[in-house]
């Protein structure tokens, strides 16, 4: 029995409440594959589902990579760690490929509003960034380049079409600056991008509408936290907190 769109959306909401994000992602993937432009609510459900699904693997990958480095003297343990890391990598790559296919085949093509286009291009930048975190060699160069291209395109549209206080524009600036810091190792560019986004939003705080006030101010706080962390790291202090992402 095939479910119609409203049933699939309901299933995704149930799965979210049960914290079964793989089920949530599968339901929203099926909604997307019906080929209609997603509503804001559907778009957010899709994003939350995959963010949790991929986030669990990114976290596992970091833990296992760290353990692997600590077991260098024990060949057997290190081999076991390597095999397990590669299993997690394969899962992460499959998830990212799924999302990138949905973005290229349906979501970016069907986006009629600048806001949606920026949202999906940011998502494309994010998932290529996640791939680049576990890639090596030529593959890494390709994923890094694809990520930067998607972020840059989204960034240019957001500057033309959206208020500096818009949560999607701010979230893009946050993640693009993390990309510069973590992936391209360009702290100056990362700090400049984050600071500009923060300052421009502060200057127009009175344009914030009621519904996005909480989202926008939260992202502004993350931008400021990252700036503080990155500045202290570049002055030689060891920052122990991870970068905030949206």
UniProtKB/Swiss-Prot annotation:
GO CC annotation: cytoplasm; cytosol; melanosome; nucleus; perinuclear region of cytoplasm; protein-containing complex; transcription repressor complex
Upper classification of the organism: Eukaryota, Metazoa, Chordata, Craniata, Vertebrata
Gene: Ywhab
Sites of 3'-nitrotyrosine modification: 84, 106
One Pfam entry name: 14-3-3
Record-annotated site: Interaction with phosphoserine on interacting protein: 58, 129
Subunit note: Homodimer. Interacts with SAMSN1 and PRKCE. Interacts with AKAP13. Interacts with SSH1 and TORC2/CRTC2. Interacts with ABL1; the interaction results in cytoplasmic location of ABL1 and inhibition of cABL-mediated apoptosis. Interacts with ROR2 (dimer); the interaction results in phosphorylation of YWHAB on tyrosine residues. Interacts with GAB2. Interacts with YAP1 (phosphorylated form). Interacts with the phosphorylated (by AKT1) form of SRPK2. Interacts with PKA-phosphorylated AANAT. Interacts with MYO1C. Interacts with SIRT2. Interacts with the 'Thr-369' phosphorylated form of DAPK2.
InterPro entries in the record: 14-3-3, 14-3-3_CS, 14-3-3_dom_sf, 14-3-3_domain
Modified residues (Phosphoserine): 60, 186, 232
Record carries keyword Lipid metabolism: no
Post-translational modification N-acetylmethionine, affected residues: 1
Protein name in UniProt: 14-3-3 protein beta/alpha
N-acetylthreonine: residues carrying this PTM: 2
A GO molecular function held by the record: identical protein binding
Post-translational modification: The alpha, brain-specific form differs from the beta form in being phosphorylated. Phosphorylated on Ser-60 by protein kinase C delta type catalytic subunit in a sphingosine-dependent fashion. Isoform Short contains a N-acetylmethionine at position 1.
Subcellular location: Cytoplasm; Melanosome
N6-acetyllysine: residues carrying this PTM: 5, 51, 70, 117
Record's signal peptide: none
One Gene Ontology term from the biological process aspect of the record: negative regulation of protein import into nucleus
Alphabetical UniProt keywords: Acetylation, Cytoplasm, Isopeptide bond, Nitration, Phosphoprotein, Ubl conjugation
């Amino acid at each position: 029995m095939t479910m119609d769109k409203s049933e699939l959306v309901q299933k995704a909401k149930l799965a979210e409440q049960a914290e079964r994000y793989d089920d949530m992602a599968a339901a929203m993937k099926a909604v997307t594959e019906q080929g209609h432009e997603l509503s804001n609510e559907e778009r957010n459900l899709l994003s939350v589902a995959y963010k949790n699904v991929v986030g669990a693997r990114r976290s596992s990958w970091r833990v296992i990579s760290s353990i692997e480095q600590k077991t260098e003297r024990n060949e057997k343990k290190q081999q076991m760690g390597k095999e397990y890391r590669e299993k997690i990598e394969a899962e992460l790559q499959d998830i990212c490929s799924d999302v990138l296919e949905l973005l290229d085949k349906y979501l970016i093509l069907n986006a009629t509003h600048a806001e949606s286009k920026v949202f999906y291009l940011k998502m494309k930048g994010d998932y290529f960034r996640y791939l680049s975190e576990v890639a090596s060699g030529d593959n890494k160069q390709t994923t890094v380049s694809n990520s930067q291209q998607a972020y840059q395109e989204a960034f240019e549209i957001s500057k033309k079409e959206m208020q500096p206080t818009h949560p999607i524009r701010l979230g893009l600036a946050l993640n693009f600056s993390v990309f510069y810091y973590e992936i391209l190792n360009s702290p100056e560019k990362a700090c400049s991008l984050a600071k500009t986004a923060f300052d421009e939003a502060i200057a127009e705080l009175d344009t914030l509408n009621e519904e996005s006030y909480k989202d926008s101010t939260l992202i502004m706080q993350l931008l400021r936290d990252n700036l503080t962390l990155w500045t202290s790291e570049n002055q030689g202090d060891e920052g122990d907190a991870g970068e905030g992402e949206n």
